[in-house]
Each structure stands twice: as structure tokens, then as C-alpha cells.
């Protein structure tokens, strides 16, 4: 539909469709119409639109930049110290920023003309889950050999006869200015961790080798890579269960020297310019991407091809070597990823060819060996044997090189970055270590360094990360403080502001190593949590045992009290005992009543004469007997009369007794009247003389009829 339009360049449309297969053709054609068939502008626009069709969600460049990791740039350059210009790097090859993965930091290489840039990219084990912010990023397209086996080319290979007709001719010009970078800046917001760089002491004295180490505090925010890039990833011990798709072509790439370009505008290797894909070394696996499909994306000032791990090829004016060392599994030795370095002819013929990945195609006079060993950071408690990723026998001409090394901790390391940790897990601040080459007086300051006839210099650079604190210590600290925060995926970088909407995509498309590392960290976290819960359970069990012991002691005390109460001597009497006591009490009461009645009966018979009863004293206690008081004659006579009158005969009958009692009462009344009349002048005589009780001999008042002491009647 859109290909039939006369306003569209068919070749440019074909190239864009090949690089952005996920974008509909209508969108591509509309973008071409808006940008007037400008391949550079279209690639920038389509790379921004690609994320919408990849993940159905658009991620702004700021979010993507925040999700990437921080960098360490080590610049190795053979150039005059006066030829260092921070803005020359992007003008030499128009290289693009290498985007290792979605969680990588933004790569801001130095704009240096004659330097060798080594960028240490510290990144977690994660495949790109978020589209990169660079305008040339396309995770579905990988340039030729750099294409992963998991993403086969969308179209059949084409012959590398010439560049596309729609390519900007300024791409082949040497110092052409790069396109304007996106509007995000580098933010150094991470704490510093020292990186050890060890330069071998046995450097050849006759060679012009780097002799100074310059550490720059900042790096210009440039989207595009500096001239010539060598990308090295550290080999990671990823889990064998699930490898990242990029590992297949990386493992297949053989070891060996890599062809490079010299710093001359003219073709360096004319005998290899017409190289065909069949000239690849037999050791290299023939992957379907090995044939040249389209001009290498980095040949233009605007890097529009966006392979995930794309080497920055140089422009024609300043070709430079590109060696990409992807992460290889620990089982295989680290390989130098051969990005077929395109050697260019004159700007007029735009012929592009790929150099075979063999040592025989290299000019021996322009080789330099750079050996970079990333030392594993030995952490306490974890035996980490990371396979180093040196550039073994990596010949590079004396021109600017950018070496990007990912100092990724292995997935077996428990100290992977977790958002709950208080400090940044990847505590590597952007540090730029620049090797400046002292030049002789014959070298004039120029953007392009000198070409030395026979340098075979070996740089041995040992890069090691400082030991980070073990996660076990952090877990111990969390035990003391509070409950640990939940584990977040490793792909979610701490401190990133725009990761809320895209961390799920990062986890969904993360590599096996990221999953393995996340699993290890999660297991470590869960193990620490389990230990903490076990301690709490132990304490709770001890408390339970203590409470059980207390309950048992209390029950024992209660039982003892019950036993003491049951065995008490003052027990409640039984009903039988109460009945017996009640009957005894009743019998006593009856006996008392009978005695009283008997006494009353005896009193009614007159004065009781103990002498008349022989056995009277046999029934009472013996005691002193008081003799009767002597009274007057008349009184004695009256008493005798009363005794006679009140004498009761036991043998008399009842009527006789009643008559005698009445007569005795009349006599008594008469005697009382007589006594009162006789004793009236005195109180004593008026009341009468006190009388003695016959039983107890108590002297009672004359008005009383009964004794006060023994209650016996006065007259018996």
C-alpha cells in the first residue's frame, strides 16, 4: 500500500521494515513521510514508537534512563595530552550508545578523539524488558552476527554489495556531527566503590604505551558512543536451566584476534573489502544473521539499528575496532564477540564488507593486545568463582577504542541489589580512568592519534569491584531492627522513579541468570526469615512450658488445700450424731422438770425436817449445818404453831390436805399481821426478822419467800 506511493523511498522503507518488524507498515510509511525519507530521523522516531508495539505501553526516555544502571568508564587512549577534546568522540564515528539491557545505566562515553574508552557497565543479570531510550534501539533487530538466535531475521539476507540508497552520505564522512542527543542528562547519584586497575609492570619500554592514569570526575552527557568501542561483559555464572537468548551466538563465536581498523580515512584492509559471508572461519557457527542484510546501523551518524548489544562501528573517516564481549556462561570460556568490523572504501563507493573473524586477516603491524581481567569481588560467606572475561589476544590498532565491561556480580552471589537494602546495591559511581599516551615532539595535536609502525603492546588491566557487604549481614541487622521488607525483582533498580509500570515487563522477559539470582536472593531472604521465625517459635515454646509449669504448681497447691480441708478434725457432725445429742438433751430436760415437780410437792407438805428423815443427808453433799437462831418465846411459839399447821402427813388423803393447807395459810397471815404490828416502831421490826434458809443457811430478807441462793422455799 505505502510502497506504491511515489513519495516513499522503497529502499528506506524496506530497511526500516527490516529493523522495526513490530511496527506496522502504515506507521513506518507515515513516519517516512513526516521525515522526508530521512533514514536517520525515521530510525529515531520509530525507536521511540517501538515500545508501544513491543509492550503495549510507552515508556518515556526518562523512565528508561532511570531504570538503567550506572557506568564506569575507563578510557585507554594513545594520543597527545593536548589533543584531548571532550567533544571529538562523537564526531569520529557517530557511534550509538550501547544499551546492554533495560537495567543498564546510561552509557555516556567520553567525546575523546584519540582515546581508548573502557566503560565498565555494572548491570544485573536481566534481559531487556523495557525498550531503550536511544533513538536507535530495536530489540528485535540485531546486526548480522550480533543478532541473537532467538530473533531470526525478518527477511532473507541480502548481499553486502553496497550501502542502502537511502543512507545519509554524511554517515561516511569522518568528522560529521552526530544527531542531537535526547533530552536526558547523566545523573551521578550512586555512591562510589573503588575499582582496582592494575597495569602490568613488564610493558615494553620502547613502545609508546600509556604511562599516566587520569581520573575524570564527570562525563559529558552524550548519547552517542565515542569513536571505536570494545564492549566486554563479564562472564556470569548464570543458571544452566534458562540461558538468555543472546548466549547462543556468543558461545558460538570462537576465540581469537579481532580485525580492527586503523585511524586513517582510507581503507585499511583493501583485500577484505569485498568479503563475502562464506569467508567466515569454519569455527564460527553459521547463524542466519551472518549475511549482510542492511548497512550496519552504526555506519551512520545516527545509530538507527538497535541491536540490544550493538557494537559502535566507526565512520569512514575514523574507523575503529569494535570488539564485543558478551556474557558467556561459566561453562564456556569467554569469547570475543566478533562484530564484523565493516571496512569502508572511499566515500564515493559506499561499499561495505565484513571482515572474517580470523587472525590471518589482521595486519600484524597494527595490533595491540589489551588484556582486561575483571577480578571477582570475594564476599564473606560466599565462594564466588567468576570466570574472568579478559580480552585475550585482542589486537587493536592505535586508535580510539571504547571498552564497555559489565562488572556484573554472578548470579550465585547473594549480595544482589535488593530495594529493601538501605544502600544502593550496585554501589559503583561513574569513575572515568583515562590512560593518556605521552607522545614525542613529532606528534602534533590532532583528533586522530599517530599511527605507530610495529606496536605489539600488551595492556593488562585488572578491574575489580570492591567487596560489598554480604546480604547475610544485612539480614542479621534486619533481625535486630524490624521485619524485612518484601523482596522486589532484581530488574527493578532502587531509586528509579519510573519503574512502577514497567518492572513487571522486566521480570517477565528477564534472563535465566536474573531469575536464578533473584531466586537465590529470595531463598536467602526466606531462609533468614525462617530462622527468625524459628527463634520466635522457640521463645514461644519456652513461654508455654513455663506457663504449664505454673499451672501444674497451682493445681498441686489447690489439691493440697482440698486434702487438708477434708482431713480436718473439726468435721461437721453426722445426722446420726446430731440425733443422738438431741435425744440426750431432751432426756436431761425431762429429768430437770421431774426434779422441780418433786421439790414443789415436798414443799406443799409443810416444813421439811431433815431429822425426821433418816436418809435425808445421804442424797446431798455433806456440808456445815447451821443451827437455828434462838428466837423469843412468842416467836418460837408461833413458829411451832406454824410448823404444826403446815405439817403434812404423807398418809393423809387429799381433802384433808386441802383443809390443812387452808388452815396453814390463815395462820400464816395472822402471824404476819401480828409480827408487823409488833415491829412497827422499828423498820426491822416492821419488816420482820431475816430468816435463815434451811437448805443453804443463807440469811434472807423477811419479804422473800424463797432463798436468794438456792431458791428453796422459806417454809418447808
Swiss-Prot record:
GO terms for molecular function: K63-linked polyubiquitin modification-dependent protein binding; molecular adaptor activity; ubiquitin binding; zinc ion binding. SUPFAM superfamilies: Ran binding protein zinc finger-like. It comes from the Eukaryota. InterPro entries: CUE, TAB2/3_CUE, Znf_RanBP2, Znf_RanBP2_sf. Residues 163-173, 375-408 have a biased composition (Polar residues). Residues 233-246, 269-290, 409-421 have a biased composition (Low complexity). A zinc finger (RanBP2-type) spans 686-716. This is TGF-beta-activated kinase 1 and MAP3K7-binding protein 3. It comes from Mus musculus. The lineage of its organism: Eukaryota, Metazoa, Chordata, Craniata, Vertebrata.
